[in-house]
Swiss-Prot record:
GO cellular component: host cell endosome membrane; host cell Golgi membrane; host cell plasma membrane; membrane
Keywords: Glycoprotein, Host cell membrane, Host endosome, Host Golgi apparatus, Host membrane, Membrane, Signal, Syncytium formation induced by viral infection, Transmembrane, Transmembrane helix, Viral primary envelope fusion with host outer nuclear membrane, Viral release from host cell
Record localization: Host cell membrane; Host endosome membrane; Host Golgi apparatus membrane
Pfam families, A to Z: Fusion_gly_K
Protein name: Envelope glycoprotein K
Superkingdom of the organism of origin: Viruses
Native source species: Varicella-zoster virus (strain Oka vaccine)
Glycosylation sites: 55, 65
Length: 340
């Protein structure tokens, strides 16, 4: 993983997010709720509002333009109110009847099946995407930007455009093109100098180099944002729909978040290799050293680009091809679609 410019901890985090997304997708497609809605209800005479699952012994009524809770983010909570009785006329006639104690006024609804597909799954995918952006920003900075630790730096010659240019020039033009490779070597020397200045006085360096500051800020924002989105996935354990979800769903959400936090913490506190050990590890002489460097450069560039292209292509194709179809088959048309 180090040859690809990715720490083992970062690779583990991407695998955990991917596994969590696959499990959530499987659970959403396989789960069958007898009643997929939960209701925020109160009695006729007024009282505390209580979220609860559907109860066959109760009569649920709703009033036009009378709701304490707005619909959630799934876009399908309205479907839970389609078959409810109108309370505008029924409540007045039922006050003096034996049905009085069984009537519940619905003040809010949640479609729990739609929540998993439209909220939980999308948050996991979004966290995966944002964390992937962070890793890409970080890899670019390891090649071109300043780093306080020289052990974090990787050779700019691993930049995939360098290899692509070399292949095109050798195959199509028939002669080697080395200007970009020489430029990247110059960039490497300049980067090392910038890293020394950055290590000596980071505040002044960031003040003098606004562009570098902006790029590093984007990297930090992507990292923090991905962590915040992962924390939001814990909402599955505290949403009103948690009444319908099995206990292992809530436990799994906590296990994933805690595991990600532990892995992130380990990546920060784990001792870094010293500069001498790092140089001794990467500087191998002779033909073996040349072959190792070339293979690492070529394979890292190809592997990282193929990884990104394949993953994003598959994600886009699946999302575009199946999302609307699955949503309609599971939940029917959304409220916005019906209005149009």
């Amino acid at each position: 993983m180090q040859a690809l410019g990715i720490k083992t901890e970062h690779f583990i985090i991407m695998c955990l997010l991917s596994g969590h997304a696959v499990f959530t997708l499987w659970y959403t497609a396989r789960v069958k709720f007898e009643h997929e809605c939960v209701y925020a209800t109160t009695v006729i005479n007024g009282g505390p509002v209580v979220w609860g699952s559907y109860n066959n012994s109760l009569i649920y009524v709703t009033f036009v333009n009378h709701s304490t809770f707005l619909d959630g983010l799934s876009g399908y909570d309205y479907s839970c109110r389609e078959n409810l009785l109108s309370g505008d006329t029924m409540v007045k006639t039922a006050i003096s009847t034996p049905l009085h104690d069984k009537i519940r006024i619905v003040l809010g609804t949640r479609n729990c099946h739609a929540y998993f597909w439209c909220v939980q799954l999308k948050m996991i995918f979004f966290a995966w995407f944002v964390y992937g952006m962070y890793l890409q920003f970080r890899r670019i900075r390891r090649m071109f930007g300043p780093f306080r630790s020289s052990c974090e730096l990787i050779s700019p010659t691993s930049y995939s455009l360098n290899y692509v240019t070399r292949v095109i020039s050798n195959i199509l033009l028939g002669y080697p093109y080395t200007k970009l490779a020489r430029l990247l070597c110059d960039v490497s020397m300049r980067r090392d100098g910038m890293s020394k200045v950055f290590n000596a006085d980071p505040i002044s360096f960031l003040y003098m180099h606004k562009g570098v500051t902006l790029l590093m800020l984007l990297e930090v924002i992507a990292h923090i944002s991905s962590g915040c989105i992962v924390l939001l996935t814990l909402g599955v354990a505290y949403t009103p729909c948690a009444l319908l979800y099995p206990t292992y769903i809530r436990i799994l959400a906590w296990v994933v978040v805690c595991t990600l936090a532990i892995v992130e913490l380990i990546s920060y506190v784990r001792p870094k290799p010293t500069k001498d050990n790092h140089l001794n590890h990467i500087n191998t002489g002779g033909i073996r050293g040349i072959c190792t460097t070339c293979c690492a450069t070529v394979m890292s560039g190809l592997a990282i680009k193929c990884f990104y292209i394949v993953i994003f292509a598959i994600a886009v194709v699946i999302f575009m091809h199946y999302e609307q179809r699955v949503q309609v088959s599971l939940f029917g048309e959304s409220e916005n679609s019906q209005k149009h």
